[in-house]
């Protein structure tokens, strides 16, 4: 299991937005976080479509959180950018799920792990990742 670059960059970007009360342009965000601007723009568009961030046009425009930082969790971000984290191997085309007894026994282990990952990430909010001495978009 590996978190994608898209999710990694997306979390960094949205966390940066959570630490300011003013909208940030894509350029400013890319520069601050050392992220590729074109790629960041695609990530932010996905987050905007999911109502995790909002954009404002104009001179004082840019991106900001659509909700308070304590109401956005890491699982939401992961699902939007990459879908649910899967640790199990997809079945080979045409293979029955329980073709052999070992398939049934091991598949439950992976499903349980996936459920636990989802639960854990659902309990981690953006606000909980911000150092206490930094004001954040609450």
Predicted regions located by residue number:
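N-terminal helix-turn-helix DNA-binding core of bacterial DNA-binding proteins
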Residues: 3-35, 54
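Key DNA-contact positions within bacterial/archaeal DNA-binding proteins
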Residues: 38
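Basic amphipathic alpha-helical segments that dock to polyanions
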Residues: 43-48
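Residue cluster at the C-terminal edge of the helix-turn-helix DNA-binding motif
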Residues: 49-52, 80
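Beta-hairpin "wing" of winged helix-turn-helix
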Residues: 52-65
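Conserved segment of winged-helix/HTH DNA-binding domains
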Residues: 69-94, 111-115
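C-terminal regulatory/oligomerization modules of transcriptional regulators
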Residues: 92-138
């Amino acid at each position: 299991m590996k978190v994608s670059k898209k999710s990694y960059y997306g979390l960094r970007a949205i966390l940066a937005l959570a630490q300011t009360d003013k909208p940030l342009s894509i350029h400013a965000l890319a520069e601050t976080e050392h992220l590729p601007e074109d790629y960041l723009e695609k990530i932010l568009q996905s987050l905007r479509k999911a109502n995790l961030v909002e954009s404002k046009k104009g001179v004082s425009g840019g991106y900001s959180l659509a909700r308070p930082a304590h109401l956005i969790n890491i699982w939401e971000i992961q699902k939007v950018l990459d879908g649910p984290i899967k640790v199990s191997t997809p079945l080979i085309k045409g293979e029955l799920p329980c073709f052999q007894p070992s398939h049934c026994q091991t598949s439950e282990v992976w499903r349980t792990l996936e459920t636990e990952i989802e639960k854990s990430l659902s309990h981690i909010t953006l606000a909980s990742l911000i150092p206490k001495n930094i004001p954040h978009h609450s």
